[in-house]
Amino acid sequence: MRTLWIMAVLLVGVEGSLIEFAKMILEETKRLPFPYYTTYGCYCGWGGQGQPKDATDRCCFVHDCCYGKLSNCKPKTDRYSYSRKSGVIICGEGTPCEKQICECDKAAAVCFRENLRTYKKRYMAYPDLLCKKPAEKC
């Protein structure tokens, strides 16, 4: 199990502080980020294009938009701290960038949990070539 967790942390294909975001996703959904969220739909994973395929993919679209609104931050690499109080993610102290990145990741992890019932396995490892429709604006 430890090897699987390390692999998930290393391979998770979402932007942000990979360790913290992967941990949040696992805690919220009880699913490993890899394979469930790394190549899902048109937006989960590196980059994104086209129209989100469903509510889970929309979580990733909104997450990408959230990162896009951060100025002078490095969401792919900046580490942050968070804790839980009564099961709720509480973003910790840190720089304004760290706090904003944490809030983006928190919103995505909670969104994944809220949409577990509509998650569709057919969108796992979804080919980019099927994401050709014009992209939405954030």
From Swiss-Prot:
Active site residues according to the UniProt entry: 63, 105
InterPro entries assigned: PLipase_A2, PLipase_A2_Asp_AS, PLipase_A2_dom, PLipase_A2_dom_sf, PLipase_A2_His_AS
Keyword Metal-binding: yes
Tissue-level expression: Expressed by the venom gland.
PROSITE patterns for this protein: PA2_ASP, PA2_HIS
GO terms assigned for molecular function: calcium ion binding; calcium-dependent phospholipase A2 activity; phospholipid binding; toxin activity
Subcellular location: Secreted
Cofactor notes: Binds 1 Ca(2+) ion.
GO BP of this protein: arachidonate secretion; defense response to bacterium; lipid catabolic process; negative regulation of T cell proliferation; phospholipid metabolic process
Binding site for Ca(2+): 43, 45, 47, 64
Cofactor: Ca(2+)
Disulfide topology: 42-131, 44-60, 59-111, 65-138, 66-104, 73-97, 91-102
Cited Gene3D superfamilies: Phospholipase A2 domain
Reactions catalysed according to its record: a 1,2-diacyl-sn-glycero-3-phosphocholine + H2O = a 1-acyl-sn-glycero-3-phosphocholine + a fatty acid + H(+)
Subunit structure, as described in the record: Monomer. Homodimer; non-covalently linked (alternative/compact dimer conformation).
Described purpose of this protein according to its UniProt entry: Snake venom phospholipase A2 (PLA2) that displays local myotoxic activity. It also displays anticoagulant action in plasma and edema-inducing activities. In addition, it shows cytotoxic activity to a variety of cell types and bactericidal activity to a variety of Gram-negative and Gram-positive bacteria. PLA2 catalyzes the calcium-dependent hydrolysis of the 2-acyl groups in 3-sn-phosphoglycerides.
Similarity field: Belongs to the phospholipase A2 family. Group II subfamily. D49 sub-subfamily.
Protein name, UniProt field: Basic phospholipase A2 myotoxin I
Organism: Bothrops asper (Terciopelo)
Native organism taxonomy: Eukaryota, Metazoa, Chordata, Craniata, Vertebrata
